[in-house]
Amino acid sequence: MPVRFKGLSEYQRNFLWKKSYLSESYNPSVGQKYTWAGLRSDQLGITKEPSFISKRRVPYYDPQISKYLEWNGTVRENDALAPPEPQIIRTPKPQEAEQREDANHETVLPQEASRVPKRTRSHSADSRAEGASDGVEKHQDVTKNHSLVNADVELRPSTKPLPESIEPRLDRHLRKKAGLAVVPLNNALRNSEYQRQFVWKTCKETAPVCAANQVFRNKSQVIPQFQGNTFIHESEYKRNFKGLTPVKEPKLREYLKGNSSFEILSPEKKADEPLDLEVDMASEDSDQPIKKPAPWRHQRLGKVNSEYRAKFLSPAQYLYKAGAWTRVKESLSHQGSLNAMWYAEVKELREKAESYRKRVQGTHFSRDHLNQIMSDSNCCWDVSSVASSEGTISSNIQALDLAGDLTSHRTLQKHPPTKLEEKKVALAEQPLENTIRSLELPEAPTMARRKLAWDAAEGTQKEDTQEEPSGEEDGREARGKDKQVCAGELQKVDMQTSKADGPTEGSETSSVSSGKGGRLPTPRLRELGIQRTHHDLTTPAVGGAVLVSPAKAKPSALEQRRRPSSQDGLETLKKGITKKGKHRPLSLLTSPTAGMKTVDPLPLRQDCDANVLRVAEGTLPVLKNLDHQTNTPGQPSPCTLPYCHPSSRIQGRLRDPEFQHNIGKPRMNNTQLLPHGAFNDEDADRLSEISARSAVSSLQAFQTLARAQKRKENFWGKP
């Protein structure tokens, strides 16, 4: 017989079965509801508890104790001979006779037998089963020895009345023998691990009549045991879910033609046919309308508005506008079309992909960017902008050359272009990295080439006497033009200051560049010890379009207040320069140019001091040879050569080796710049004063630098 566990498991206590619609309408019979009513535990299939290691093993026999070890207590010997009469237990009447027989049977044994150690029983349903089985087995012995017990009772009449209260253990023992339900002892020490985890399913307290009927059925062997239908043959799954329809057999056309009224009915419709007939018959009998009892079917429910459907609607209810999908409550006529739904998004994605492709290829230029590169004024940013076309450039752009040798404009007018071309070729053949300049003091805002020692004094005095009238004539011509007023005055001032302060404060710095153009090779840069920047790592020697510009030096409010007007500043500078030029001695020994640090107004890199000194010392003999060859009686002095030093231009130019996207045009590159910290506040003041005098040119310069700075910041896009 299979073991069927009828107790409440932990799963059944925590997870209750959710009643379906069918189970609520299903009304089982009483026998099906209480299938275990009136059955003993052994009949339920529970014979014993599972054997656990933690459960103490107890023998199944009563231990034999000798009489001299028995404990008599306060009972006298004569009382032990006369057994007490059984107490009438308050139980139903059908049980009185049976309990009297059990009590008479107990009188044969002495009263102390109840104090004999009993076998240890577990307090689960199997203990009740054992008690019930013991009662059934002893029932035969009681019927056989009934006459003998009565004779013994007659021979030994009871002389002592029954005590008012019976010991609870004895009462529990009698209840067990009678087959009644006994409340288990709540002793935690005797509970097993299994009992502590799982609570047995206990029935409700039954009425006295039910208890008597239970005892009567358990004791009598004539009446068969009532066993109802312990399990339901039809499962709930079969009741709720119907199987697939059987496979239809092939039918002939003739059969279908003969039975034209043949209708294929599903099993659900066939099951509903008797219900329809009953409803029709009932409606004919009574005029009152009767509602048809709709049986429960396993059918698909209606459309439920779930949370997912409320949040995620169909794409037809959205419209793409301004880079985002927005929900449109009103139904539009053209909303469901492909153009309205997807065309805008696809177009935007393709434009983004094209911009990303151009960014990777380096061709993402706007119209303004391209116009600036291809414009005519682009040559102003060139390093080697001293060309025949430079004379046609407007003077306001010429003023951007803040630190250059501005005598080139005068030499263009004095000498024919053929001689100028020869000089430029001669300069290009010389190592350009040996040129030296200096911007040390604020009184000398421009750069002048260092003169030789033997004609330093004479040559300079001649230059002063010859250049001043020519400079005045150039200034008078420039005043006639509206666009060249500020630039012409600035050229005179810078020229005179270069003549006065050139020998003593002339600069020497080295700009190392490659002769052919482009960036120097990496081994050469490593030998020079030049610190590389992120542009050197990414920008190739040919091509590329990375445009950067240095940070703009903004003058403070006090400096702006102290700035004189353009006319006053020019007059004061002229007077001061002429005085200094007359009284200052010119000698090479007192000149601080040899081995001095130079000042770069816009430094971009950091160079070591040792590199600057080493290159400056190496350039001295080269300069001597260069000046000796070019300084002939028929030619002007080297200070008037139409050459503008590369480092004197505005940094951040388009044709700089940092931005080599204008290929095929002659240029001079500057790869070695000055050490960090050489740029001071005095240089910023000088730049601000010059830009204030040339308002038009400075405005254009700052606008160009601002555009370059903006392109630099927006090159990779803002995060």
UniProtKB/Swiss-Prot annotation:
Q: Which domain of life is it from?
A: Eukaryota
User: Gene Ontology cellular component?
Assistant: centriolar satellite; centriole; centrosome; cytosol; microtubule; non-motile cilium; nucleus
Annotated TM spans: none
Sequence motif ST]-E-Y-X(3)-F motif 4, residues: 306-312
Query: Locations of Basic and acidic residues compositional bias?
Result: 93-105, 123-144
Motif ST]-E-Y-X(3)-F motif 1: which ranges?
9-15
Against InterPro entries, the record matches this protein to: MDM1
Where in the sequence does UniProt note compositional bias of the Low complexity kind?
Answer: 503-514
Listed GO MF terms: microtubule binding
The Phosphoserine modification is found at S124, S127, S266, S283, S286, S314, S565, S566, S591
Please tell me which stretches of this chain the record labels as motif ST]-E-Y-X(3)-F motif 2. Answer: 192-198
Location in the cell reads:
Nucleus; Cytoplasm, Cytoskeleton, Microtubule organizing center, Centrosome; Cytoplasm, Cytoskeleton, Microtubule organizing center, Centrosome, Centriole
Q: Which residues form a coiled coil?
A: 339-364
| PANTHER family tied to this protein | NUCLEAR PROTEIN MDM1
- What family does the entry list? Belongs to the MDM1 family.
Main role?
Microtubule-binding protein that negatively regulates centriole duplication. Binds to and stabilizes microtubules.
Return the protein name.
Answer: Nuclear protein MDM1
Source organism:
Rattus norvegicus (Rat)
